[in-house]
Structure formats: C-alpha cells, structure tokens
A protein has these predicted regions:
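Glycine-rich nucleotide-binding loop
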Residues: 239
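C-terminal nucleotide
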Residues: 1-59, 66-96, 100-236, 244-264
Length: 264
C-alpha cells in the first residue's frame, strides 16, 4: 500500500494519538504538580487515513514535519527530531505547542512521557518509557475506537479559564501513568478508567477544553453516554475532534487505528 494513490497523498510521516495525561507537557501545568513527574501517553499510529484538521491528532505539527523533512522522517535519533521540530513549530509563538505533539510523531510505539518542571523547565520529558511490543500494539489497535465528533472551531481558545489545583494536576499526571500501565498489561478496563480520569482532570483544570461558547457541539453529554456504555472514553484534544472509546466490542460509526512499533 506504500505506493497507493492514498499513501502518496497522505505521506509517510506517522500520525500521533494522545491518550491520558495531556496538558501535563505544558510547563504552566506541570509546575503545579506536587508529586513530579507527571505522565502522559502518546501513541504513534500509521498514516493510513487523513485526520480532520484541528482535531487533536497533531495534524498541524505533522504538516510542518512534512515540509521540513520532505514527507519522510529522517534516519536520526527521535529525541533529536523532536527537538528540531519543536523549535521550528514554536518559533515566535506566545503559546507554544507542547513537546508531546512532536514526540508522538517521531517516537514509535506507545510512549509514556514523564514531565518534571525542575528538569528542562518542564518543556521536554525528564524520561520517556517506550513499549514497542507487537503484541501490545495489536491489542491496543483492537480496543481503541475513534468516533469523529467535530473539529475545534475558529475563535476557540481552551485556556480562558485555568483552575490549576495542585491536587488535580497530580491526578492528571497519575492518569498518564495508569494509562501506560494498563496498556502494557493489556487491561482494557483499567485503560478505560485512565481515560475517564483524564477527562475529569481536563474538565476541572481547564474547563474551556470541553465547555466554551464557540463550541457548536455539546461535548459533555456525548462523552458521558459513551463512558457509561463502554469501558471508557476521552476526546482526542481540546474542543472535541474525535472521541476515543475503549471497547473490546465494535463501536458503531467509529474506526480503528494501526499502532506503529519500531522496525527491527
């Protein structure tokens, strides 16, 4: 399929999926963590579909990477690639994108990113724990279901209200740890619980992530319904995008992704 018309259109650079713990990569959040490091999980997924723009799949970062590296990841250490991409994307930005966007694109497999404000100012992880087990990747590809909801609209800013309670920042970082542990153990129930905890943290810390006058869709009722019916659910990013549902059974209307692991 590498030479198919769709593959040529999309390009060879992977996509990235953010799971539990997102926002802990931002120094304005992780500086309030009383129990550092706080963790989050990113997953590299195959570029076999075109994601909606402005939907939490790091399509903006990937677009920059496509231009910077002419459609293909260079054969260099992923840490080096992530830092280079971070510098290019955030040059002159008042509100820089978090480093998880870049790391998720260039690190294969499932990655737990540990952030500590005392290490590199909380901009880059103090440690990255990676899982490139084909068995785990196949399992995760089977239990994650993406349901398109709606891209975040123009004029939307998720940072209008910040309730950065240290206790809730600690819970956010713990949701990432729980998420990674559940994936490595292939425990769908605990994975769903980690995604649900992540959403409680987002709703508490940064309420405009899920509630905002510019949003045309009521995100919370959709989230709650899927959390009640399935093992767990979270939005792919601020303002909606996709609803990521954890289920060992099919989810009508959703599609599945292919988790990429390091090639031996």
């Amino acid at each position: 399929m590498k030479n198919s018309p769709v593959a040529k259109l999309i390009g060879a650079i992977p996509n990235r999926l953010q799971l539990a713990g997102g926002w802990i990569d931002q120094p304005f959040v992780n500086q309030h963590n009383p129990k550092p490091p706080g963790s989050m999980v990113v997953v590299q997924i195959a570029p076999d579909f075109r994601p909606m723009d402005r939907s939490g799949i790091a399509s903006g970062t990937r677009h920059i990477a496509m231009k910077l590296w002419k459609g293909k990841l260079p054969n260099r250490p992923p840490e080096e690639l992530a830092r280079a991409l971070y510098e290019v994307e955030n040059k002159g930005k008042a509100e820089p994108s978090g480093s998880q966007d870049m790391i998720g694109l260039v690190y294969p497999g499932v990655n737990r990113l540990d952030y500590d404000f005392k290490v590199q100012g909380g901009v880059f992880p103090s440690h990255i724990e990676s899982c490139n087990s084909p068995k785990v990747a196949k399992w995760l590809s089977r239990v994650l279901h993406l349901l398109p909801v709606e891209p975040r609209p123009d004029g939307y800013n998720p940072l209008g209200v910040k309730n950065l309670s240290p206790a809730w920042v600690a819970k956010l970082g713990q949701s990432g740890q729980d998420c990674y542990d559940a994936i490595v153990k292939m425990d769908a129930k605990k994975l769903g619980a980690a995604l649900n905890l992540n959403m409680k943290c987002w709703e508490t810390l940064l309420p405009h992530v899920v509630r905002h006058p510019a949003l045309r869709v009521e995100l919370i009722p959709i989230l709650k319904a899927y959390q009640q019916q399935y093992l767990g659910a979270m939005y792919s990013g601020c303002g909606g995008g996709y609803l990521i549902v954890v289920s060992e059974k099919p989810v009508p209307g959703a599609f599945q992704v292919n988790v990429r692991v390091a090639q031996k």
